[in-house]
C-alpha cells in the first residue's frame, strides 16, 4: 500500500484558526467540535453525544479514571467524561482561547478541581510516564505530522493496563485512486491535516508503540452525514455575510465543507474508531 501524502502544517496557523473561530464553532456547532454518530434521524448534537458514547463504551472507561484529552477543544469531551464517569480530566489544546473558554466553564460548573485545561503543542509534548488511565483523542491526531512518535508518547503516559481511545479522520484503506488525490489534497490543506492515513496505518502505529489493539472499526457510514449538516451551516446567510470579513484560510476552510461530503460519498475518505491498551505489568501484549 502506498504511503499517505504528507502536507505541511504550520502549528501557528492551527493555533490561530482555533483562537479565531472557537466562538463561532460554539455558536453554530456547540461545544463538541467533532463528528456525530448517526443511527437514524438524530440531531447533530445528539449524534455527537452518541459518538462519545460509542467510544467510551468500546474503551470501557472506568469510573473515576484519570484522563488526558489531547486536542480537547472547548472541553466538550472532558466535561462529558467528568459528568458521566466521574473522571478527573486534563485537557490539552494548542489554543489559548480554547483553554481560557473551557477553564471559565469548568469554574462556573464548580469542576476546576477535576477538569482542567493546559495550553500545549502535542507535537512537542514530553509526557510524564505512567500518569493516566485513559488517553482520549477525538479528531485531533490529523494535525500531527509524526503520528508514530505521537502514539509512542501516548503509550508512555498511560499507566500499565491503561487505555488509548481514538476517533480519527482517515482515507480509504486501499491504494489511493488518482481521482482521489486532488480531493484529499484540497481537504488536507483546508483542514490543516498533516496527513490522512488509513485504518491499517493507525493500527500498526499503535502496535509499534507497544499497545494491544482492542478495536479498529470503520464507522464511516454512521459519521458521514455530519458534513451534510456542516455544509448547511456553511450556506447559512449569517455565515455567508461574515465570511468576506475573515481571512483566506477561514474561507478555504468553510468552502471545504462540500468537499467533505463529496469525499465520503465517493469513498475517498473514511473514519475510524480505535481502542488500544497498554499491557499491565507482567502481561504479554496482544497482537490485536
Language-model regions, residue ranges each:
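Short, glycine-/aromatic-enriched active-site segment of Class I SAM-dependent methyltransferases
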Residues: 170-193
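A short glycine-rich, Lys/Arg-flanked "PGG" loop and its adjoining helix->strand segment in the class I
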Residues: 148-163
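N-terminal auxiliary segments of SAM/dcSAM-dependent transferases
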Residues: 1-27
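Conserved alpha-helix/loop element of class I SAM-dependent methyltransferases that forms part
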Residues: 31-32, 42-63
